[in-house]
Amino acid sequence: MTIDNHPLKKHAEKLQTLVTSAEFTDEQGESLSYSEGFENTLKLLKKSRAQKACVFLIGNGGSAAIVSHIFNDFINVGKLRAFTLHESSLVTCISNDYGYENVYSKPLKTLAQPNDLLIAVSSSGKSQNIRNAVNSMKEVGGKVITLSGFDNDNPLREMGGGNFWLNSRDYGLVEVGHMFFLHFLSDHLKP
């Protein structure tokens, strides 16, 4: 089998098509060009760094693994005050006492300040705990960036000041696309 027709190459081509056809929208749901979407997101991160604001990153499952990884790069490369909220004892405490749907919103109500930024990652965009966290961040006056996929009408896709959406129901492709976008942002945060 040559590389030209190998399944790995075809899968990589699917990823390329998916990422290059990503859709960006603003808080009014207005479509943004690829350049505008990326630049607006990068500006929010640079503004957070300049203001010494916190950048909180959340996700479930594979999305939690993605934000754990990018958290390192945001601190090491981007010099951001970045934090994840899925430390195991905190997750079990909040889930037990307040329900898993509040696992991120409850800590954000305590920790987040106006001008802080939340990056919410959910492949389906339907996770209640992620959407509750977005609402909590908005309540304290913070900014929100969402990364989602799957259905065009997923609720998370319309909740952020900036929204990055991938038109696929393939978890693996959506997750890798989210990681690609976040890595690209991190690479452009170098001071």
Question: Could you say what each language-model-derived stretch is?
Answer:
Residues 1-191:
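Conserved N-terminal alpha-helical segment that immediately precedes and caps sugar-phosphate-binding
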